Amino acid sequence: MKTHPLVSFVAVTVVSLSVAMADEKISEVPPAPGTALKEATLESVDAALKHGVDFLIVDQNPNGSWGGPTRTKGLNIYAPLPGAHHAFRAGASGLALAGLIDAADVRPEAVAAVAKGAEWTEKELPKLRRAEMTTTYNAWGHAYGLRAISRLHGLAKTEAEKSKWRTLGQQQVDLVNRYEDINGGWGYLDLFDDLATQKPSGITTSFTTATVLLAMHEGREEMGLKLDEKVVASSLLSIQRQRTPDESYVYSHDHRYSPRSPINRPAGSLARSQACNACLRDFGDETITDEVIHTWAERFLQREGFLSIGRKRPVPH
């Protein structure tokens, strides 16, 4: 009797997953060489926060934004001009501003940096759109911009100020909805199928989708923003399809068919997993328990050296 190829594929995949998970227990994963953890103290944490705030203050652009195409290291980053740079700057600025606000530093220079960042956000973020049909880098700008807006709403003292940030936040939700992929969720490239479509048909990625949904959830909790439940449901389903039994998440929708390739194994999912776990948990997935969160936090701390390679070495890939 012949076996259908799909049945064989499923069987091999299940066996591979089971063997891999049996071979690698999280508690037995040793720290990467040279990454032994130092015991944290309140003093060391405070010093680290101040160091980060000091960097953001010094690194802020004169117009209140952060980031810019000035240290590319000659890498092959596909960036259609000028929209790609607008998207990256919006994403970097939103992330930096959100972190600066979370640090709650009351020094005058830190307060001034927040004010400059808020002014830039109010003026420039509404202009953000897709650079062209081949990229949706703007998803990062909408998501991290929305995280900053939620915090600016929390800082606002008057109803007029709060209303201003709510309006801008709702605009960002509505804009990013335009760029949801046909498979649910969001990606950042749409150039591999030789199709140019109004609604992206590229590669939706688990981590981009989680980033956008986390920002939406926070915006709804903080400002009462209205979310499109169809968009939310299809995007959550996209993440679930990219989830493996050990709470690793494959890189993209197409990677579902090679779940144990190196990029999709636990070390490859190091930064993706907690974003996706947090997203699913925020939207009510009860399978993302405290144990799952703690397990992946431990794994992250043990293997953070992998991320440092991509962050600091000349060629991140």
Predicted stretch roles:
Residues K2, V19-H317:
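Preference for long, amphipathic alpha-helical scaffolds in soluble/luminal domains
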Residues S8-S18:
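Bacterial N-terminal signal peptides
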